[in-house]
Amino acid sequence: GSVIKIDKKKKKIKIYKKNKVKTLASYNLVKTMRAGILVLGPLIAKYKNAVTSLPGGCSIGARPVNHHLNSLKKMGMKYFIKKGYIHAKVNKTLVGNSIRLPKLSVGATENLIIASCLAKGKSTIKNCAIEPEIKDLCNFLIKAGAKIKWIGKRTVEIIGVKSLKSVSYTVMGDRIECGTFCVAAALTQGNLKIKGFNPKLINTELNLLKKVGSKIKIKKDEINIKGSHNIKCINNLKTKE
């Protein structure tokens, strides 16, 4: 139900809300991306009801949305699933609660944070995912008037407000996109300069590329990478949540 204007030259997107907003997110819209489930929290928090299709998958595989639903249920949301659609509603408004996510989930963390901004009272969300994109989302919401405070590495406290205001915000760069270009340069012995991206966001990846032989120089918002003709192997690479 929004009006969206895209300025490709200035790389800007303007979103204008219509007076009447649809609270139905159809399968044709939601199936295109995993993040489609993220419309549930905002819709139920602001408009008190929502009908949204179960989200599409991604190359990582099928991932359930039970953490989203169970957590929002603790804030007062009632729902049922019928023919692939989540039918959700809340009486009056969502109410803040203390919620511990049973598993680290970027999407569930984002949905809860957004919903809590317009809920009544205080919400404490524990065992949050802490990807840079989540911190960026919080910065955007704070600029829009939300009251968000991190009180631990994986705990966030939110005091609900009546409404959020319109703002202008620059979204952080895409870590996956930037990392992909860096790896491509390393594999093809290329010489690449990436501008407009904070190198600290992929510091771990850049350090690994240095270990395989790439020469990397970084500035405030710039990465220079030159691939090596003698790519080295990394042994015992271990990742963690």
Named regions from a protein language model:
Residues 1-241:
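Short, structured segments at the rim of ligand-binding sites
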